[in-house]
Amino acid sequence: MNLFFSAPPLVAELEVGHHLYWHLGKFTVHGQVLIASWIAIALILTVVLLGTRQLQREPAGLQNFIEYTLEFVQSIARAQIGEKNFRPWVPYVGTLFLFIFVSNWMGNLFPWKLIPLPEGELASPTNDINTTAGLALLTSVMYFVAGISKRGLSYFKKYIEPTPVLLPINVLEDFTKPLSLSFRLFGNILAEELVIAVLVLLVPLLIPVPVMILFLFTGAIQALIFSTLSAAYIGEALEGHGGGDHHD
C-alpha cells in the first residue's frame, strides 16, 4: 500500500495564492505587483540615465544600445501607425515594449527569493492579470484618444456603421481586442514561471537552463506582439476601420 500512497513529491512545495496586500484607505492593492513594477521601472530608468548622461556625436556603448532600441521602437510605430502620425505615439509604444520586455525577463533572471516579504513571493509583474489587464485598458484609452484627436466627436459615428444594429458589437470589439492581448501575455508569462519553478525543484542543475533561454526568447516575442498590436489598434483609430494608409 505504501507504494501507492507515498509522500507527495517536491513539486507540492510550490505554493500559489499567497499575496502581499496593502490597505490604502478603502482600497486594497497588490503589494507584490507594485514592488516588482517599481523594480522594472527603476531598471529601465537607470539604464536610460546612464546611457544618456554624456551624449556623444558618435554613439558607443550604452548610448549606442539606447539609440538602437529607440530606432527599433520607432520602426514599430511607423509600420503600424503610418509615417504621418507615428511620432507622437513613439513614447507610448516604447514604454509598453520596454516595460513588458524587462518584466518578462525579470521573471526568468531576477533572484526574487533574495527579497523576503511578509507574505508571498515576488514575481514578474506581467504574470499578474492586474498588470496585463491594466496595460490593455490603457491601450483602449489611447485608442479612443487617438480617434477623437484625429476626427473629433465624429469618430463615434463608426459605431453605427454600416447600420446602428451593430452598435453593441462594434463597442465590444474595441474593448475585446486589447483585452485579448492581456490574457495572452498573462497566460504565457505565468506558465513560463510555473514551468521553470517546477523544473528547478525536480532537476535543479541542467534542464532549467535551456528552458530559461527559450523563455527569454518567448518573453521578448510577447513584448513585441503586445506593443505592435497596440500600435496597430492606435493606427486603426487614426485611419478608420478601412485601414487607411497606416502602412505607408
From Swiss-Prot:
Topology term for the membrane: Multi-pass membrane protein
Record's keyword terms, sorted: ATP synthesis, CF(0), Hydrogen ion transport, Ion transport, Membrane, Thylakoid, Transmembrane, Transmembrane helix, Transport
Residues that span the membrane, as ranges: 31-51, 90-110, 129-149, 195-215, 216-236
SUPFAM superfamilies on file: F1F0 ATP synthase subunit A
Protein's UniProt keywords contain Heme: no
GO-annotated cellular components: plasma membrane-derived thylakoid membrane; proton-transporting ATP synthase complex
Main location: membrane
Gene Ontology molecular function, alphabetical: proton-transporting ATP synthase activity, rotational mechanism
Entries under InterPro entries matching the protein: ATP_syn_F0_a_bact/chloroplast, ATP_synth_F0_asu, ATP_synth_F0_asu_AS, F0_ATP_A_sf
Keyword Chloroplast tagged: no
UniProt-annotated location(s): Cellular thylakoid membrane
UniProt superkingdom: Bacteria
Subunit structure: F-type ATPases have 2 components, CF(1) - the catalytic core - and CF(0) - the membrane proton channel. CF(1) has five subunits: alpha(3), beta(3), gamma(1), delta(1), epsilon(1). CF(0) has four main subunits: a, b, b' and c.
Function summary: Key component of the proton channel; it plays a direct role in the translocation of protons across the membrane.
Family: Belongs to the ATPase A chain family.
Name the UniProt record assigns to this protein: ATP synthase subunit a
Organism, scientific name: Synechococcus sp. (strain JA-3-3Ab) (Cyanobacteria bacterium Yellowstone A-Prime)
Taxon lineage: Bacteria, Bacillati, Cyanobacteriota, Cyanophyceae, Synechococcales
